[in-house]
Structure formats: C-alpha cells, structure tokens
Amino acid sequence: MQIKQNISLKPYHTFAIEQCSHYLVEVGSVDELVDIYANPDFRELPKLILGSGSNVLFTQPFSGVVVVNRLSGKTLSEDESFYYIHAEGGEDWPNLVEWCVQQGIGGLENLALIPGCAGSAPIQNIGAYGVEFKDVCQYVDILMLDDFSQRRLSAEECQFGYRDSVFKHALYNQCVVIAVGLKLPKTWQANNSYGPLQEIAEHELSPMSIFHKVCEVRREKLPDPKQIGNAGSFFKNPIIDKAHWQQLKAQFPNIVAYPAGEQMKVAAGWLIDQCDFKGVQVGGAQVHPKQALVLTNAQSCTAQDIIQLASLICDAVWDKYQIALEHEVRFISTVGETCLSELRVES
C-alpha cells in the first residue's frame, strides 16, 4: 500500500479536471482500509472514499486523504429461485453487469454502462430505464469507521430513495461500503417500458437484447469520459407536486414527466434543452450538444467553469419553470462535500 503525496486527481475522476490531493492511497483490502483510518498521522485530516470518480467534481485542491477503493472480487451462488451475487466494493459496475448477462443472468441489464464501482451503487441508488439498485439489492456490507466493525445492512435498512440512501444521511461519513449483495430471480421478466427499449421485438426480448440496446442508446446519447471528461447526468430529475405539474402542462403541453408516487418526476434534460443550453459553453465547460443533462470538460476546463455553467442553467430553469434543479454530481471542496448553492454564496 503506497501513500502518495501532492498527487494529481485528474486520472482519478472522469471530469478529468486538474486538481490535486495532499495524500492519496489505493486500498485493496479491508485491513488496508482500517490501517489508513486508524493511522494517527491521518486521524485529524479529512478523508474521501473514491471509487471510479465518475460522480464527483473537485472544486478545490483536497487537503486530506483520498482513499481509492480497489477492493475486488465477486462470487456467484444460487438456489431454485434466485441467483445471488456478492461483489466487492471496488468492482467495476459496467463490467459486473456485462458479466452477469454473459452468464445468462438477467436483472441488471437496464443498468448497463452506468459508470462507477459496485460500492458507489447503493450510495446513489443508481438507476436507469425503469430499474434502480434497490430493486436488485439483497444487502450492503459496510465498515464502520468509529470502531472498525463490519455490518450487513438489508435493503430496507439502506432506506433507498431517488438517488438517495441512508449513506447520504444517518451513515454519511460514518462508514465505507465494502461489498454489495445482489438477488436476481431466475424467472426473468423484461423491463422494457422505457423509450427505445420498446423498439425490441417481443420475440427477441432477452437480458442480452436489452443489454445491447441500453449500451447502444447510452453510447449514442452520452459522451465517453475517456474521450470527453464528464460525470454523466449532472442534475437529478426534479420531483414536483401534481398541482405544479398541471400548471406547467397547461403552459407547456410537451413537457416530459413521469409519475413518481403522488408526485411527478420531470425530465431535467428536457427543461435544460427548452432553455436552449445544448452546446452552450462557459470557459472550457460545455453542455453536451446531444444531451443537455451532461456537462463536459470540452477544453481544459476548470471547476469554476463547471460551477458557472451549472449556475446559469439553474437560474434559467427556475426563471422559466419555477423548478429548482439539484445536482446529482457530488461537489468536493478542500475539506469535504459541498454544494452549488454554498459555492455561489461564497463567490
């Protein structure tokens, strides 16, 4: 286990913005994880657990220790009705989904090509095309940071919500996700109700056909972070009450939204697109020309470029629709997590 000092974070997050961390260490086991958190030299320093860095924006140099989760490995077991997959927290999520499909195991195919590690999936409750992590989760294994005990949380204990979980609230900064357990029924049912997935002929429906269609759509709509720095969907789809929705529907008949319990989930990409932001650039940051929900590092951008562009978008959407956009991407300052509203106050 090598502890690096004053290291560039550019290779460790998909926005690929030049920013540095005072310390960085890659951990390959729970014991190494404990060693870092128990180290008296680091005890008073802020720490950040990082997986693939696919959902973060470093707004300033990080003054503490970035701990990169490299815990790897997966096991498969089964009974008459289910497949059970245990995946270590550092396992690459897209590779895990593809591996399952290749094994003939269905249930994860709608979540194909979502960048990140298995350990990040429950924190965000990742989701796409009608499926969320909570739908396939059996348990989440965590390391408590106060006494270094290990606990197994049931899906119910994780308190999953829309891009939300207990790890953003009661357990925020209290634990590290070291593994996840997935439970996938052997009696597979296609989830093809979303958009392009409906194009698959009924006789061709299979985990593999949905997997390929999801990959095709994502590659067509979303830029590859290896080619253009980005963190995927920058904003959450806002949830509004039905009264607000009906007012907007009367004024904007083509508004795109879906039921979310007693409320409505509005397509943030549509809102941003209708405010004419596709292709708009601030400094080196740009709204992707094909997908308004994605902000990119188009030309050696700075974090401030992204912040300014995101602020312009939020203001425009609020002025036109009275909807407050919330960023899905995590903002990391010099000592830990922050948010766009705080940064705007500071500036």
UniProtKB/Swiss-Prot annotation:
It is found in: Cytoplasm. PROSITE patterns: FAD_PCMH. Its cofactor is FAD. Gene3D superfamilies: 3.30.465.10, UDP-N-acetylenolpyruvoylglucosamine reductase, C-terminal domain, Uridine Diphospho-n-acetylenolpyruvylglucosamine Reductase, domain 2. The active site is at R163, S233, E328. HAMAP family: MurB. It comes from Vibrio vulnificus (strain CMCP6). Residues 16-187 form the FAD-binding PCMH-type domain. The keyword Flavoprotein applies. Keywords: Cell cycle, Cell division, Cell shape, Cell wall biogenesis/degradation, Cytoplasm, FAD, Flavoprotein, NADP, Oxidoreductase, Peptidoglycan synthesis. The keyword Cell cycle applies. One of its GO terms (cellular component) is cytosol. Belongs to the MurB family. This is UDP-N-acetylenolpyruvoylglucosamine reductase. One of its GO terms (molecular function) is UDP-N-acetylmuramate dehydrogenase activity. InterPro entries: FAD-bd_PCMH (IPR016166), FAD-bd_PCMH-like_sf (IPR036318), FAD-bd_PCMH_sub1 (IPR016167), FAD-bd_PCMH_sub2 (IPR016169), MurB (IPR003170), MurB_C (IPR011601), MurB_C_sf (IPR036635), Oxid_FAD_bind_N (IPR006094). Pathway: Cell wall biogenesis; peptidoglycan biosynthesis.
